[in-house]
């Protein structure tokens, strides 16, 4: 669980910014979306391969440009 202590003379906005950063770095939302429903291991590996292909194509296009 992500928690943030408010420091002396710190505004609520700064405290919220720190909380949001910690929240993103911890990967809470990403993990929640991943566990929202079950994905079979075979489907997961197929999706991983397609993501890698797309990433490689983008990198290749950027290097050629």
UniProtKB/Swiss-Prot annotation:
GO biological processes: translation
Gene Ontology cellular-component terms listed: ribonucleoprotein complex; ribosome
Gene3D superfamilies documented for this protein: Ribosomal protein S8
Entry's transmembrane regions: none
Entries under InterPro entries matching the protein: Ribosomal_bS21, Ribosomal_bS21_sf
GO molecular function terms attached to this record: structural constituent of ribosome
Entry keywords, A to Z: Ribonucleoprotein, Ribosomal protein
Family listed: Belongs to the bacterial ribosomal protein bS21 family.
Stated name of the protein: Small ribosomal subunit protein bS21
Lineage: Bacteria, Pseudomonadati, Chlorobiota, Chlorobiia, Chlorobiales
